[in-house]
Amino acid sequence: MGANNGKQYGSEGKGSSSISSDVSSSTDHTPTKAQKNVATSEDSDLSMRTLSTPSPALICPPNLPGFQNGRGSSTSSSSITGETVAMVHSPPPTRLTHPLIRLASRPQKEQASIDRLPDHSMVQIFSFLPTNQLCRCARVCRRWYNLAWDPRLWRTIRLTGETINVDRALKVLTRRLCQDTPNVCLMLETVTVSGCRRLTDRGLYTIAQCCPELRRLEVSGCYNISNEAVFDVVSLCPNLEHLDVSGCSKVTCISLTREASIKLSPLHGKQISIRYLDMTDCFVLEDEGLHTIAAHCTQLTHLYLRRCVRLTDEGLRYLVIYCASIKELSVSDCRFVSDFGLREIAKLESRLRYLSIAHCGRVTDVGIRYVAKYCSKLRYLNARGCEGITDHGVEYLAKNCTKLKSLDIGKCPLVSDTGLECLALNCFNLKRLSLKSCESITGQGLQIVAANCFDLQTLNVQDCEVSVEALRFVKRHCKRCVIEHTNPAFF
């Protein structure tokens, strides 16, 4: 299916010989005049180009008034209505004036000092500019226009906005960036289009075809993309390491395309180089899909499966078999994960540093004991809402994971001051502790924690029956600690 889609999209892309045939453009070629009615991005991240309004590549609604040119006339985009389109500026034209007339009209101006800088210095200066400033620089003169399109300034493309026609924007941008290196954007390493709901498989296929050096792709919340498009990207971008498909409900698996598997390309060797994978809210993902992911993505170190509600302990067994290098794992709100699943996770041993099992209602002290025994270098544990955890589970954890820095055991009603005391006497490096809605916690337990964990920075005791005196005691001993509470008498 991926191959068929590829042929369809590819044939369409070759049918156009110029950028102007794909999008309607309306530009102001007068370097000294500022364009009006162009929405500009205020993104302060200088390393990422927020292309919601990039000139060189403007993304703006066509129903805005036409851009005013130097003579006061306007040209509007009339071929496309009711959608956001990508617009690409042409270089500012060179004014042709007879030299005698120019000399007679006014004396020739001296060259500006900034124009004496070499191109590489100008590009370095441009690299520190936000997108809206780079847009203005592109309209100053022909030289600045060309420099603004230097591929080194476009290592990252970031598109934002729910209504933007992101498929067309990606097509226009990649085509322009491919002018110096036909058909490929060798410098482009990061594409972020999270929240662009109009992104479809067509847009991802454009990325797959044109960005062989892609290392990071974020398509969070783009619920129209499917497995086939993701397969195309991971098959044609062998260097991809970071993939965020959270909220993409149609994505149920990650694998190579059939063609890539048959060819056994040396770029892959049947393996995908992804190390970071976020599949939060991919609620259609099942154990078999996770099995396929684990078998192909053996280099995974960070995996987030929050609210993948169909996963069970069996899926975690597959994961541990193939992905032995996982450092961070989240299975929060996976209601079928139980102590048997934690027994499998414990096989990751000392490599595991981060674990989130929040609201996994089937987890008890038994599962916590497995993790505490084998994952001695655990630094972060989120067990909020695991109502089966008691003081015994906290004791196992405290005595074996002594370098624990962050612990969330909120909404664990069976945890009391006894568990807190054991925690305080063993985990001196604790920096973040959440006890929200722990009904059995009192001020005495908090005082023991404060007296031993001097580096505590965040303490959540909302909906806990603790006195003002206990909170003041914590504040005196942990001066940098931010206390989240619901006691109106403490401020």
Swiss-Prot record:
One of its GO terms (cellular component) is ubiquitin ligase complex. It is found in: Cytoplasm, Cytoskeleton, Microtubule organizing center, Centrosome. InterPro entries: F-box-like_dom_sf, F-box_dom, Leu-rich_rpt, Leu-rich_rpt_Cys-con_subtyp, LRR_dom_sf. SUPFAM superfamilies: F-box domain, RNI-like. PROSITE patterns: FBOX. Residues 111-157 form the F-box domain. Residues 1-79 are annotated as: Disordered. Pfam families: F-box-like (PF12937), LRR_6 (PF13516). Residues 10-26 have a biased composition (Low complexity). Belongs to the FBXL7 family. Part of the SCF (SKP1-CUL1-F-box) E3 ubiquitin-protein ligase complex SCF(FBXL7) composed of CUL1, SKP1, RBX1 and FBXL7. Interacts with AURKA; interaction takes place during mitosis but not in interphase. Interacts with BIRC5; this interaction allows BIRC5 to be polyubiquitinated by the SCF(FBXL7) E3 ubiquitin-protein ligase complex. Substrate recognition component of a SCF (SKP1-CUL1-F-box protein) E3 ubiquitin-protein ligase complex. During mitosis, it mediates the ubiquitination and subsequent proteasomal degradation of AURKA, causing mitotic arrest. It also regulates mitochondrial function by mediating the ubiquitination and proteasomal degradation of the apoptosis inhibitor BIRC5. This is F-box/LRR-repeat protein 7. It comes from Homo sapiens. The gene is FBXL7.
